[in-house]
UniProtKB/Swiss-Prot annotation:
Database matches in PANTHER family: POLYKETIDE BETA-KETOACYL SYNTHASE 2-RELATED (PTHR11712:SF322), POLYKETIDE SYNTHASE-RELATED (PTHR11712)
A Pfam family that the UniProt record links to this protein: Ketoacyl-synt_C
Biological or metabolic pathway of the protein: Antibiotic biosynthesis; granaticin biosynthesis
Annotated GO biological process: antibiotic biosynthetic process; fatty acid biosynthetic process
Other remarks on this protein: This putative ketoacyl synthase lacks the active site cysteine.
Domain Ketosynthase family 3 (KS3): 6-406
GO MF term list: 3-oxoacyl-[acyl-carrier-protein] synthase activity
Entry-linked InterPro entries: Beta-ketoacyl_synthase, Ketoacyl_synth_C, Ketoacyl_synth_N, PKS_Beta-ketoAc_synthase_dom, Thiolase-like
Record's protein name: Granaticin polyketide putative beta-ketoacyl synthase 2
Listed Gene3D superfamilies: 3.40.47.10
Record bears the keyword Zinc-finger: no
Superkingdom classification of source: Bacteria
Length: 415
């Protein structure tokens, strides 16, 4: 049995709900075929807005996946999280028959907005009709921790649980928190969920940050590391991963991929210190016991904002050398899913390790020479993959990095 300081956390199940891909394999196929999930907003009239595009999930019908009693009390983002948690737990084989105690099963979630759609609707009732018309479920449906609570209640997961807020890096932070939790107790297992809903208020409010693309063409609006990059497109969805104690996973025959995750905050503006993304990546490598030479592919944050792309490219060049490792940003096909983006990229990294292929950065034209990146473009690239680095950044200094390896970097595909 591993001692607490050496106990490994492994990913044993995953699921994705994202634009272009409802379900893990559908999502993976959409990335490999270059299916663009970005389109004009269809849930409200966006014609008056300077940005009218988003990555939307169009094929999710909540009543097909959840009991009717849950629908009046849940935001759409919570419905995504509940359905995806069901799929991930099934993928991991975690349930009553798995032999895991309820008090060893926990939930860690991250969201940057909470139940915004639900709140937007109920506040409209408050303003237009009065407080008597506001749903009693508003008391918790808006809350940042609601996904943790709803998943734990639905699946009788009574163990250590948490809700994190780390802007667009929050999803990877949740992975790190789950890893630390699992390492504290033999047999512990955490469901890690990060989902986001793209709404009228949430999408339009991002315009004030000055980083959202106003390009009208869905094929050219979000172009990470491209000469024509002009901002990002918001999207909805995310992923759920099951993080488990390796000894427990081994005992029940689960497939295993190792995961390590540190996080770092950017220094204060004007301090003269470099951004902390590189330090987060270095720590992820160190905790995984790897060097930059061991990394087969980087799933980049890919902001689509020239100055942010340049900063990330410089970080990768310092760490790996100019064009020293294949880099991809598959979120160009889905939009940035806020806290859900990191876990969706992590799911893609796990699938890339499984199938030994790197998905391309969609609709890319040309990398600026100054970036010195080996960016995977045009079509997927087959490669011998044993370890992947996944990066995520949020506004106001949030940075997170995760390293995943295939069966402990032994270059074997899972069976």
């Amino acid at each position: 049995m591993s001692t607490p300081d050496r106990r490994r956390a492994v990913v044993t199940g995953l699921s994705v709900a994202a634009p272009g891909g409802l379900g893990t394999e559908r999502y993976w196929k959409s990335l490999l075929t270059g299916e663009n999930g970005i389109a004009e907003l269809s849930r409200f009239d966006a014609s008056r807005y300077p940005s009218r595009l988003a990555g939307q999930i169009d094929d999710f019908e909540a009543s097909e996946h959840l009991p009717s009693r849950l629908l009046p009390q849940t935001d759409v983002s919570t419905r995504y999280a509940l359905a995806a948690a069901d799929w991930a737990l099934a993928d991991a084989g975690v349930g009553p028959e798995s032999g895991l105690d309820d008090y060893d099963l926990g939930v860690v979630t991250s969201t940057a907005q909470g139940g915004f759609d639900f709140t937007h609707r109920e506040f409209h009732k408050l303003w237009s009709q009065g407080p008597a018309y506001v749903s009693v479920y508003e008391s918790f449906a808006w809350f940042y921790a609601v996904n943790t609570g709803q998943i734990s209640i639905r699946n009788t997961m009574r163990g250590p649980s948490a809700a994190l807020v780390g802007e667009q890096a929050g999803g990877l932070d949740a992975i790190g928190h789950a890893r630390r939790t699992v390492r504290r107790g033999p047999g512990w297992c955490s469901a890690v969920a990060s989902t986001r809903r793209s709404t009228r208020g949430a999408s339009s409010s991002q315009l004030s940050g000055g980083l959202v693309s106003t390009v009208a063409d869905p094929e050219r609006a979000y172009l990470p590391f491209d000469v024509d990059a002009s901002g990002y497109v918001p999207g909805e969805g995310g992923a759920v991963l099951i993080v488990e104690d390796a000894d427990s996973a081994r005992a029940r025959g689960a497939e295993r991929i190792y995961v390590r995750s540190p996080l770092r905050r950017d220094p204060a503006p004007g301090s003269g210190r470099p951004p902390a993304l590189g330090r987060a990546a270095e720590l992820a490598l160190a905790e995984a016991g790897l060097t930059p030479a061991d990394i087969s592919v980087v799933f980049a944050d890919g902001a689509g904002v020239p100055e942010l792309d340049r900063a990330e490219a410089d970080t990768l060049a310092r760490l790996f050398g100019p064009r020293g490792v294949p880099v991809t940003a598959p979120k160009a096909l889905t939009g940035r899913l806020c806290a859900g983006g990191g876990p969706a990229d992590l799911a893609a990294a796990l699938l890339a390790l499984r199938d030994q292929v790197i998905p391309a950065t969609g609709r890319h034209r040309a990398v600026p020479d100054a970036y010195a990146l080996d960016l995977v473009t045009g079509r997927p690239r087959e490669a011998a993959l044993s370890a992947a680095l996944v990066l995520a950044r949020g506004r106001h200094g949030f940075n997170s990095a995760v390293v995943v390896t295939l069966r402990g970097s032994d270059h074997r595909r899972p069976t």
